[in-house]
């Protein structure tokens, strides 16, 4: 049996570092939290290669005295608490005294620091936990931490670091969350010598949101502010039509500390229930202030998890406040969405008032986006500064719609359906049924020499052949044909695109931008034509017809969320979009069809294989035999 050995300090520190230093992003978190605790009013973060090779955090805080510099790198040394009782009252972000010791154990560190009352600064260089150089230097008041070559001495940890883009995205998320926690601090974030964002440090949360996220993000938020003895709650929540595919933009702070909380998420999502689609999540930036004794932040080494001592009260407070704000803001939200130009507003309503027959004519003459459809676009010269309405052009001269679409042109003629049975069939009728084998035979053999009787309720095509009557759901039939067409395009990676008359420039948060650029290969086969366009922006020159007319570009954010969650675009998501597109383009119930249109639709149905169901699973074809009809009339038993 092996003997029990006492590990040396170097090994202990490397192992312990794993609890604190998960990667470059956790180093950034610890260093910036230290800078905030030091009272800095200006903090700069600079990274290179996703923080794996270089991280610099500079603040103008109180600095560290020359007497305390060495102690700062010792484990469990801190200026923030002195006893266990202090944990229940501390407002500082750090308190364990482990960060610098852990970081210096697995990287190369330079620290330059100077307190206000000291005439010189101290430069300290540490490699693998050992001080290699220390000297006096001239420097401004504050502290600069430079971290190089993370995990240089722990190859297994280095091997499992994520890609540069992925690490950059995690750091971008972390710095944005920390900037939002401290609106009174001016933050500057630099990635590979490019300034990503700066915040003004004017003390207003709205200023930080506008600096960190895209303009559209802030425009869709609702302010929330509650001040009660037991709890203060302030920040922003999203309008009900501004949601994401995951919870990554549910941002919570408790007493200024960035945390993740299932309890708070559940309270907010319950308030939104019934107001937003299933599997969508509201966006929020909320700061909660409570008595420090009512929360335990020492749950996890990352200090992002929290345990509330009064969970039920917290849940109900948040749920009630969010519910109230949503109910009060519904009217305001509608007013804010009114376009600034009166003519545009009137035209929008005019388009909605087009009667059904006109809409159907358009939908059957062209598969895709109509020139009358408007989208919100950005002027290329001004990049993402302002959005203006522009027309979208379908520039697909070589892409031919299916034959039935070209031939189905609604006319004023209406078939005489007086010969159709006028009495309603009993609901419990056993005569109407679906049968795959019957459908197969019907498609391949019996769709010949039939007699068109007409339309029933302008929704169902009625045909007669031999001793049977067949009912065809015109919408379901056309929808299935379009679904197959679009699905085949996707399988062959020949998805038709629509060129935008004016390309659209979209601005993203840095983390979303990095995710999109890193996974751009997921978007190209879907029919997108897009590329990087300046800082945190992409330009879209074409979008897939598959995704229907681009009234807005929320589907881009949905796809980004898919990639974040699943590492790729889920097939189910694409299938759902195909179904939606097919449903919108298909002939509708109450469309009046002439005899030529009906015959063309039936000819196209010959291409289908059973089961004859629409993409939603509803039957396309039903049959009623003469024998069954005679039984209904009691002519036979």
Curated annotation (Swiss-Prot):
Q: Name one Pfam family in it.
A: MutL_C
Q: Does the keyword Ion transport apply?
A: no
Biological process terms from the Gene Ontology for this record are:
mismatch repair
Q: Which UniProt keywords apply?
A: DNA damage, DNA repair
Q: Which GO terms describe its cellular component?
A: mismatch repair complex
User: Molecular function (GO) terms listed?
Assistant: ATP binding; ATP hydrolysis activity; ATP-dependent DNA damage sensor activity; mismatched DNA binding
Q: What does this protein do?
A: This protein is involved in the repair of mismatches in DNA. It is required for dam-dependent methyl-directed DNA mismatch repair. May act as a 'molecular matchmaker', a protein that promotes the formation of a stable complex between two or more DNA-binding proteins in an ATP-dependent manner without itself being part of a final effector complex.
Cross-referenced HAMAP family = DNA_mis_repair
Tell me the protein family, please: Belongs to the DNA mismatch repair MutL/HexB family.
Protein name per Swiss-Prot or TrEMBL? DNA mismatch repair protein MutL
- Per the record, the gene is mutL
